[in-house]
Amino acid sequence: MTAKEEEKQERFQLLMTQIGLQDVTTYEEFTKDAKIEKLVADKKNKTWQFHLHVPQIFPAALFHMMDVGMKRAFSQIAETEMQIVPENQTINETLIQDYWNLIVEPIGKQSPMIGKLLMEQKPTFKEPHFIEVAVHNDMEEATIQQRFQTKIIESYGKAGFPRLAMKMHMLDQSETDEYKAFAQAKQEEDQKKAAEAVQVMQKRQAEGQSGGGGAAPLTGPFQIGYKIKDDEEVKRLGDIYDEERRITVQGLIFATEIRELRSGRSLLQFKITDYTSSMIIKMFSRDNEDAAMFQNLKKGMWVKVRGSVQNDTFVRDLIMMAQDVNEIAGVKRLDTAEEKRAELHLHSPMSQMDATSSVDSLFKQAADWGHKAIAITDHSVAQSFPEAYGAGQKYGLKVIFGIEANLIDDGVPIAYNDQHIALEDATYCVFDVETTGLSAVYDTIIELAGVKMKNGEIIDKFEAFIDPGHPLSATTINLTGITDDMVKGSDPIDVVLKRFKEWSGDDILVAHNASFDMGFINTAYEKVGLEKAENAVVDTLELARFLYPHFKNHRLNTLTKKFNIILEQHHRAVFDAEATAYLAWKLIKDAKEMHNIDFHDSLNDYMGEGDAYKRARPFHATIYAQTAVGLKNLFKLITMSNINYFYRVPRIPRSQLKKLREGLIIGTACSQGELFEAMMQKGMQAAEKVAEFYDFIEVQPKPVYAPLIERELVRDEKALEEILKNIVRVGEKTGKPVVATGNVHYKDPVDKIYRKILIHSQGGANPLNRAELPDVHFRTTDEMLKEFAFLGEEKAKEIVVTNANLVVDWMENLKPIKDELYTPKIDGAEDEVRNMSYAMAHQLYGEKLPEIVEARLEKELKSIIGHGFAVIYLISHKLVKKSLVDGYLVGSRGSVGSSFVATMTEITEVNPLPPHYLCPNCKDSEFFDDGSVGSGFDLPDKDCPHCGTAYQKEGQDIPFETFLGFKGDKVPDIDLNFSGDYQPVAHAYTKEIFGEDYVFRAGTIGTVAEKTAFGYVRNYERDMNMTIRGAEIDRLVAGCTGVKRTTGQHPGGIIVIPDYMDVYDFTPVQFPADATDSEWKTTHFDFHSIHDNVLKLDILGHDDPTAIRMLQDLSGIDPKTIPTDDPDVMKLFGSTESLGVKPADIDSKTGTLGIPEFGTRFVRQMLEQTKPTTFSELVQISGLSHGTDVWLGNAEELIKNKTCELPDVIGCRDDIMVFLIYQGLESSLAFKIMESVRKGKGLTDEMEEAMMANKVPLWYIESCKKIKYMFPKAHAAAYVLMAVRIAYFKVHYPLYFYATYFTVRADDFDLTSMVNGKEAVKATMKEVNDKGMEASTKEKNLLTVLEIANEMLARGFHFQKVDLYKSSADEFIIDGESLIPPFNAIPSLGTNVAKQIVAARENGEFLSKEDLQQRGKVSKTIIQYMDDQGCLEGLPDQNQLSLF
């Protein structure tokens, strides 16, 4: 064998070692003579193809092991594949079938159907080289031939097989049946094997014991099947690549599910992880006892599982069919130290996209370890404070509330060593240094160059290399272009510095980023025994930032390019110095011209003004609230950083921190803090000066600083230890306690992957992506002591334990949220609400109020006034009143309609009294309080027996308790639906009422959702060139969800701060999503956190009031006069008769398309089944459709089985209380039952007994048990009232209805179909319907619009084309029996452009399409669309100039 051939064999053996298969002796006969013939590398596509020369085709298992091993080993470098070239190409059916699953498995990802077909069979082999597979039909055959046949043949070819041909065999009926039987048998066999594998745990307990439905009580660790021996080999999940028989794995359960099968058995499915990967485990129950035992398997358990790994065609992944499952002791880190530390630097998921472990899990861990306290220090925010306080109470921990702030100096100096030197006459020594690193203390200068400039001309030069005495690092060489050869043998640094100091003399020193260059020069001067430079200094970087703040950046190469200054070789001192000199002269002239700066000591006159905070470089500092005053000051600082000093991140100027320092403790934070940086770059003296500002000094474990070493900002671990030792010495010298903190971002080391995925999702925008992330898990006392062992045992304990607890003891116990509700005060609010209520009651019910009216008023007013809620009613009244005066109705949401006082103060139109007649003339009334009538609107028409006037009909029979609770002390939540058009006006009105400093939008916190996290994980998998099992993806997704991603504002929530307090008593303030141009500020805390402490007004935007206003404008009809029992309107909810069309015409058996709450397919089906004829029944429908488990599987079955009728079923939560009181239950118990049922808690035994004792039907009791959530009746009644009014117009004024619907509710149109008539609309509807689930959201929305359009066309109306001179910008216009669409109905034409067209039209006719495009600001695409639709007939393409 030649040397070259031997080398090829050695390369192959090296490859086997690299991929971890060097010890695979089973396949030695296949690998011993194997060679790497060549490696084809495609740099562009990052692929490597290994051409392997082998004696014969590898067994499938060996090929697979090598393929997986190569992909793992080279995942960070390239995508790998093999091309096997065997000397012997002999093949047989067994070999082909062995490879089959490997080759066809990827097809399942592209086509699950074809993948399943191929995976469930084995090909047959026909000589010479044919393989044959079975298909059921032509479609399957065509799909395989067109999409997958070539891939299959090529895959076999890459494995070394000779060129194969592929045939398809169509199964006849008998074969199809046989195939189905085979597939069924295979499935049954799998299930049978799994069931048989669940061996007897022990002899079942004594006879007669129920195997029932409940979880069997555990008397010890969970076990199903046999005990798994402690010494049995456990395989890592990450090492499982293929099907395997009878292996054992172990891990943490992170998801469980039990499914009941049609066979009566249960399927247990759970997911485990050992943090190398994750896997789905399945197990079938053998009997009821197994099924009961399944319920004892819980998320969070550690288990050992024995079973077989197999491909699951349903999940298309490897899963394990379990035979034995044993609970085992989990892997836990323990804190065994006698004296415990306390963590003072910890991040929660509120540190935006940067920390992953929940507050609860971190606090539980601290408590389990025996720590007495813990601090929260999220990045610039306090949003975890409320949750942290609750967790502290739960686990008995003292909570220290802090933030990790971005601290800035108030303006960075442009000039140092100020001197009164005329800038135009001065001589400048412009210099630059190239160094081995960023630390003036630990690194050294390797090139020093400068030029002297006078009057803009270079008059002298200085240039010198310096021998550092050691080889240069690759980073230094790459960055500077300076090599070892260039510096070797050069003068030592003391010689060069002495020459430079003499050369520069007293001239003004100039550098770009002078603090760096001067830091190196002065530190170097000190090292060699020279005096520090006292020269006047100018920093061109800060001068450029001051003069040109709008530039994107102010790097030297950017500025020289901007000003056409030659920079020949950036990062070489001589070239940088020369370019900086010309730049400096340009800047000096601009400073004179722009700001009249003539002298060196005037350069800093503007420091800190205007946007100077944007130019300052932030550094980290930890700020803690020590006292209640400090907590308020912290809230003020957070607000200030978000409102006044936000630039990329919230910033806190040092001067503001000094002003508000009372009650605060300040720590030095992490490697991004100024103390660590000063020590790293400038040395002990600078660090001591910095330390004076702080209360204590932080140091962190060496692994936390690891990225500094990786990026060569710190030379090595020894240099890092030296920095940390020096920081400890600074603490000793200054008397500041030094505390070891963890900079915690997650709980356990295995959680690091979640943070990696989150940081990776942010791309290059996040500086953390520039190096491997450090290990920043929550460390025990033992672990922390070990990290600082290099300081000596005594000193390590001092900083880890003693000083940490010392700082804890400085802090008071604080509460970041209030205990009570603080409502605004309006003088006389109580009297005003009482007087208004009685005045309206007397106006409606007469001078002598009916007893039922007065009793209800007094009951409510006692609660409302007694608990301080009158002001809330008064505010709501003012808001509604203003809207009504301005011409917009207001709909109510939630339970406010349960309050009669709310009705009397005109907050809601819903009257909650029992159904009654009311005479508008003589005020006579007649009440029905026995439950015989569901709604006053359903009473038959009747005249007043006293004066003959037609009675008004009112009352929805809703108890007050559903609004303010049984004791009337629940904080009222008044939700109001304003017109979407009017909502901004209503919001602004709150500022008029309370003042701008006392109203804020309710803040929200947007976290990473599961779908978003899935995208992050998939992108990470792709970019890291990994293949991650499905169960592992699920685990990673779960670990990334819930992390703060952004902030926002509640769509209608307004928080009102009482004027006798200020907002900082409750929460900091910020802009939503950091949008500093936002009109509104929001609460910093999520509004749920302070919901019970301050008044929240829900001023929501809704389409119904907008639609009602448009209908009123079109018709002139006051919506309040519309009858609620119009017969033709009521028919609409059960048939299409009122519309004059047949059900087939509109594909609906009811006429409620487009009616709010009743137009969806789901509710229309309910209407078809229930056929409501009254208002109260419509309220029932509304309640049933909004509840959970109220209709489906509950009321629906009761009505279908004729157990009861629609009026009898439970529709709304209030129905329960009212019905039970009518049945004779005591009112407080009726209330408790209603509350329990509506919250999905079902009934207690005592409740059931009381209901049965009062003859409540059994079906009613069972119905209550099924319910998970219920809708308030007042909400339903308000919705139905609006719906009936809109339905009135649909029946009696159809074009008004359709014009309003398309204007207010529709966003997506197909004008081509709509204009072309009914058949065109139906054809488009069919296209969308045919897509089924594959239809896009836009297409589904369009379908709804087309259903309404189809109905309008069926009723004999039609659509015109968009008319250049008639169309509105944004409203459909009625023209005879047709509608003219607005301009914004044209695809991609927005409302602003539509308004621009109308404005241009008012200034004169359009001369041409070109004129329309220019004056109307219309794109060419829109012009083309309008032209194609015939909207621009007669309009020439371009303006024409006439000569006559």
From Swiss-Prot:
Reactions catalysed: DNA(n) + a 2'-deoxyribonucleoside 5'-triphosphate = DNA(n+1) + diphosphate
Subcellular locations according to the entry: Cytoplasm
Keywords from the named record: Cytoplasm, DNA replication, DNA-directed DNA polymerase, Exonuclease, Hydrolase, Nuclease, Nucleotidyltransferase, Transferase
GO cellular component, one term: cytoplasm
Enzyme Commission identifier(s): 2.7.7.7
Disulphide bonds in the chain: none
Family: Belongs to the DNA polymerase type-C family. PolC subfamily.
Protein name, per record: DNA polymerase III PolC-type
Species for this entry: Listeria monocytogenes serovar 1/2a (strain ATCC BAA-679 / EGD-e)
